[in-house]
Amino acid sequence: MTTPTQQLSEAGVSIWLDDLSRGRLETGTLRKLIEEKNVVGVTTNPSIFHAAITAGTDYDATVAAQAAAGASVEETIFEITTTDVADACDLFAPVAAATKGVDGRVSIEVDPRLAWDTNGTIAEAKHLYKKVNKDNVLIKIPATIEGLEAITATLAEGISVNVTLIFSLERYRAVINAFQAGLEQAKENGHDLSKIHSVASFFVSRVDSEIDKRLDKIGTDEAKALKGKAGLANARLAYQVYEELFATERWALLAEAGALPQRPLWASTGVKDPAYPDTLYVTELVAPGVVNTMPEKTLDATFDHGVVTGDTVSGTYADANATLDALEKLGVSYNEVVALLESEGLDKFVASWKELLADVEGALASARKAS
């Protein structure tokens, strides 16, 4: 019997796991997800690494070794995260080979404190890429205004990029433009475009969480009827943008030179509101050529009872536009919401990073005392 995750794969959706830890690597649980649940990639972020590193004892030996070597807290975190990502890249290498690098990808994010620093982001991206030293790594760069130029410059060096924290259609257009500009420069620099890969991580459930709060405050029947619809509408219109901007003459020239399109990646796909189906942001966002990165809870729910009915995105654009128009008429400002979500998203990652710095600093101090 075909499983729902197999059906997603057959419909053109690549399933990535939104989580990574040394425990997953050493116990074989990540390998099991590849073998049994069609997982073909991994994404990480500062919050994921904070949770992994501060839970249990998996990293104690590494911290002790770093303490003995006199490493700083930043050097220790860099060593831990890049080692985990490199090991995951090795695990996914057969997938990468089988898909010619399209899947089998593992993402690692630049220090989130650099989100507003173009040159700092470029330098960090190169440093991470060199340290991990795996062809199937993706360097995650936030889609801030300052990040757009860094995305172009990083791609121009032949480095594959995961653009993250995209909430608005306008910013998504700018991201695709930055991607195509990066490939144009990479071509001029003599890089093989067929070896440069990219995804654009478009966040879904957080849009509903914020807009639903505003709809609850309005409280009318019309407002309540729109709950749980904005995230899907926004993502579906993003796919329309993807179709539009990868059907241009500009893109045709790059494709002729061997370039592959930057795939939309649905992120923030765990359902926050228990009133909604737990597979909402998976089964309702099926379209050819997309990635869906899921926390394990969402992956398990999809595998267990997800109902995959084929493409649920193409042809939905009129309804999606109508949803966003109805929200504006009720006084829910799309531009205000997406700007807030970008700011909050960055703040959360910076906060997680600072907590991680403090926790690892404490662990290093304890290790030095013990020795």
Swiss-Prot record:
The keyword Transferase applies. Disulfide bonds: none annotated. The keyword Cytoplasm applies. Gene3D superfamilies: Aldolase class I. Pathway: Carbohydrate degradation; pentose phosphate pathway; D-glyceraldehyde 3-phosphate and beta-D-fructose 6-phosphate from D-ribose 5-phosphate and D-xylulose 5-phosphate (non-oxidative stage): step 2/3. The active site is at K140. GO terms for biological process: carbohydrate metabolic process; pentose-phosphate shunt. Keywords: Cytoplasm, Pentose shunt, Schiff base, Transferase. Transaldolase is important for the balance of metabolites in the pentose-phosphate pathway. NCBIfam families: PRK03343.1, tal_mycobact. Belongs to the transaldolase family. Type 2 subfamily. This is Transaldolase. The gene is tal.
